Regions:
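Extended hydrophobic secondary-structure segments that form protein cores and membrane-embedded regions
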Residues: 6-9, 60-66, 94-99, 237-240
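Flexible mid-to-C-terminal extensions adjoining Fe-S/redox cofactors in radical SAM and related proteins
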Residues: 280-370
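Short glycine-enriched, charge-decorated loop/helix-capping segments at active-site entrances
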Residues: 33-38, 132-140, 205-208, 335
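Cysteine-centered iron-sulfur cluster-binding motifs in ferredoxin-type domains/subunits
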Residues: 11-18, 67-70, 261, 317-319, ...
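Canonical Radical SAM [4Fe-4S] cluster-binding loop centered on the CxxxCxxC motif
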Residues: 2-42
Length: 370
């Protein structure tokens, strides 16, 4: 096998927060088993051993949730022990962690630093914006704990980026959010579209990100980012970086920006494997990593079916001048009805208006960094 990447759910759908917009919470509600609990040691070892045995060149283990730190620090210490034990091919191993940050303490920060984890920290902006949708299971605010996590990451030199979910509210306060992140010297930002529950009517929740709001958000954010770029204060925003990659290389390193799906090898805590984080459903279970090779999982009929469904290009996309840049977008934003063909991207008009607005300046940036 070539280099391998896994997205792992060590605590399944378990989480100590109850964010109003959590897509994985709504997804797990539609499975026969909502949560598989904490990953057992034997599942962890089977997974590590298999990946290190079958990968070539390098491999990556990305831990998400739910909230992966609920698995405990000892779980991750065991992970490092197993990676050392089974890495007889001396592969380059990359580890990453996406966390809400509320359980991060000195021990966690020290561990993440010493073991060179790249961390994605969920934070929606300053206190009043963050706390609106990101409360814990008791309905309490979480901002102070997340802010504390950023301080610990800086203290221990943990490499981290900020993951900000774009809702109807955050879209209206992009200036305030961007300025806050700048004040905190956060240089690596990901702004992630809020997702309505799969196969439900889009736009019906208070937090729902409607296309017109997303259009304004993208334009305002781009203006702020571009001004900083011209002033020599470059901030990495993943979506804009992905557009620049597409302009310069023809393809982005961000999965959802290439128009077609690949197998992400999402591993639930019981060892079950799925092709995509947005589709961890019984219907798309490929098998179990404990008793199938990565090649066998990849070559299942379900995986081929899942990938094939994303290849159909909408008729309107075929004649759109922005298709080479947009490529139709992420499948999840084109999928509105179960067992039906993919539709036009929910944010199609947003992207069209944004590209008209920003493309000349994107070209200018691409020429500068080429």
């Amino acid at each position: 096998m070539p280099p391998l990447s896994l997205l792992i759910k060590p605590a399944s759908s378990g989480c100590n927060l109850k964010c109003t917009y959590c897509f994985y919470h709504s997804l797990s509600d539609n499975r026969n088993v909502k949560s598989y609990g904490i990953m057992r040691d034997e599942v962890l070892e089977s997974m590590v051993k298999r990946v290190l045995n079958e990968a070539n060149g390098h491999c990556s283990f990305a831990f998400q949730g739910g909230e992966p730190t609920l698995a405990g620090l000892e779980f991750f210490e065991k992970l490092m022990e197993l990676q050392r034990k089974h890495n007889y091919k001396n592969l380059k191993i990359y580890n990453s962690l996406q966390t809400n940050g509320t359980l991060i303490d000195e021990s966690w920060a020290k561990f993440l630093s010493e073991n060179k984890f790249l961390v994605g920290l969920s934070m929606d902006g300053p206190k009043e914006i963050h706390n609106l949708n990101r409360k814990d299971c008791y309905g309490l605010d979480t901002f102070s704990k997340v802010e504390r996590a950023t301080e610990l990451f800086k203290k221990y030199n943990v490499e981290f980026n900020i993951l900000c979910v774009v809702t109807s509210n955050t879209a209206r306060h992009v200036n305030k959010i961007y300025r806050y992140f700048k004040e905190k010297d956060f240089k690596f930002l990901q702004f992630i579209n809020c997702l309505d529950p799969l196969y439900e009517e889009k736009g019906k929740y208070n937090y729902s990100l409607k296309p017109q709001d997303y259009t304004k958000f993208l334009k305002n954010l781009f203006d702020l980012w571009y001004e900083d770029f011209l002033n020599g204060n470059r901030v990495s925003i993943r979506y804009f970086d992905g557009l620049l990659e597409t302009i310069l290389l023809g393809r982005s390193s961000s999965c959802g920006m290439n128009g077609t799906c690949t197998c992400q090898f999402v591993v639930e805590s019981d060892g079950s494997v799925y092709p995509c984080d947005f589709y961890v459903l019984d219907k798309w279970r490929l098998g179990n990593i404990q008793d199938m090779t990565m090649k066998e999982l990849f070559e299942t009929n379900k995986n081929h079916e899942f990938i094939k469904l994303s290849f159909k290009v909408h008729e309107e996309c075929k004649k759109c001048k922005w298709f080479k840049l947009c490529k139709g977008g992420c499948r999840r934003c084109r999928d509105s009805k179960e067992d039906s063909a993919l539709e036009l991207n929910y944010y199609c008009q947003s992207y069209k208006e944004f590209f008209e607005y920003a493309f000349p300046r994107l070209i200018n940036v691409s020429k500068t960094i080429k």
